[in-house]
């Protein structure tokens, strides 16, 4: 009797483990890969602080790689026991400092930001820490947003305004898929290019057409693409 109960218990545990693995690996439909324009983060009323590693380049930076459902909802914090382990991705840190900096105040080295992204989104991705961060870095290189915009004559310059559809078409031409453009408002009340959303398949292997676009962050027909190249010797923008 005890043996049969023991076997049954083992079977239940195995099934539960398999179910957990299944949910972890399949319980979302696609990723949003989100990049932000640093000038548009910094010139709002809340301002920003440059990382301890120095002012970032004038280029789009990674915000995150976020698992999502086709109904617009998303999973988050899928493993509350997880914690960021710097040793797991130590070979990526210098590249992440350049391409995935934190502009939040107070100034930081990025670890707090990366930890937030990993715990909230990465733990739902079915990727380990190294693969999660490496994948996001790879998609930034593939998307090449700034170059695609420059190729269309869309360059960061204060006071110039561009059509949102022109921005979308320039990115679509380079990436092959239509992005979602999120805007915010600068300290003078001007709408500006803030974040670009592209969609990635659930295996994190390629860009795809977005099953659904986010809500919020709507833009006018023309928006500013502010410069981030002005010299500034202060830590706070």
UniProtKB/Swiss-Prot annotation:
It comes from Solanum lycopersicum. This is Intracellular ribonuclease LX. Induction: By phosphate starvation. RNA binds at residues 36, 63, 113, 116-117, 120-121. GO terms for biological process: RNA catabolic process. Keywords: Cytoplasm, Disulfide bond, Endonuclease, Hydrolase, Lyase, Nuclease, Stress response, Zymogen. GO terms for molecular function: ribonuclease T2 activity; RNA binding; RNA endonuclease activity. It holds the Pfam family Ribonuclease_T2. Residues 1-24 form a propeptide. Disulfide bonds join 42-48, 78-124, 183-219, 199-210. One of its GO terms (cellular component) is cytoplasm. Belongs to the RNase T2 family. The active site is at residues 63, 117, 121.
């Amino acid at each position: 009797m005890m043996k049969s109960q023991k076997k049954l218990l083992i079977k239940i545990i195995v099934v539960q483990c398999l179910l957990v693995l299944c949910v972890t690996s399949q319980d979302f439909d696609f990723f949003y890969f989100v990049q932000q324009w640093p000038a548009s983060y910094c010139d709002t009323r809340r301002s920003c602080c440059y990382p301890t590693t120095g002012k970032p380049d004038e280029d789009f930076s990674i915000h995150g790689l976020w698992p999502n459902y086709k109904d617009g909802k998303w999973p988050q914090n899928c493993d509350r026991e997880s914690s960021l382990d710097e040793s797991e991705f130590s070979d990526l840190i210098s590249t992440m400092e350049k391409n995935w900096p934190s502009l939040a105040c107070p100034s930081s080295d990025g670890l707090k930001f990366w930890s937030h992204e990993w715990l909230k989104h990465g733990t739902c991705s079915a990727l380990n820490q190294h693969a999660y961060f490496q994948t996001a870095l790879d998609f930034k290189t593939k998307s090449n947003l700034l170059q695609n915009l420059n190729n269309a004559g869309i360059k960061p310059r204060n006071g110039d305004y561009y059509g949102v559809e022109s921005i979308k078409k320039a990115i679509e031409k380079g990436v092959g898929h239509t992005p979602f453009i999120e805007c915010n408002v600068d300290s003078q009340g001007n709408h500006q290019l803030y974040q670009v959303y592209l969609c990635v398949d659930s295996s994190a292997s390629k860009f795809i057409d977005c099953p659904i676009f986010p809500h919020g962050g709507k833009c006018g027909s023309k928006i500013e693409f502010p410069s981030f190249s002005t010299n500034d010797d202060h830590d706070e923008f």
